[in-house]
From Swiss-Prot:
InterPro entries: NA-bd_OB-fold, Ribosomal_uS17, Ribosomal_uS17_bact/chlr, Ribosomal_uS17_CS. Belongs to the universal ribosomal protein uS17 family. GO terms for molecular function: rRNA binding; structural constituent of ribosome. Keywords: Ribonucleoprotein, Ribosomal protein, RNA-binding, rRNA-binding. This is Small ribosomal subunit protein uS17. The keyword Cytoplasm does not apply.
Length: 86
């Protein structure tokens, strides 16, 4: 039996305060059904970060996975861009 294709999203880390968990904000462009204008929607996902590698401001890739807790259904795949430290 083959495994189905899992969803992959790219977003920005907005919180890394939890242990082994990051909150990733993903922006999606959708068209309004009535006014046909492009709207930017932001959705936040809690993702599993096993080694606590990602920091706030990093751009990351997350992939859908089995439920890991009440809210976590995504896991960190890679950090594509590090945030600039001030």
């Amino acid at each position: 039996m083959e495994r189905t294709q899992r969803k992959v999203r790219m977003g920005k880390v907005v919180s890394d305060k939890m242990d082994k968990t990051v909150v990733v904000a993903v922006e999606m462009k959708v068209r309004h059904p009535l006014y046909h204008r492009t709207i930017t929607q932001t959705k936040k996902f809690k993702a599993h970060d096993e080694n606590n590698e990602a920091k706030t401001g990093d751009t990351v890739v997350i992939m859908e996975t089995r439920p890991l807790s009440k809210d976590k259904r995504w896991r960190l795949i890679e950090i594509t861009e590090r945030a600039v430290a001030l």
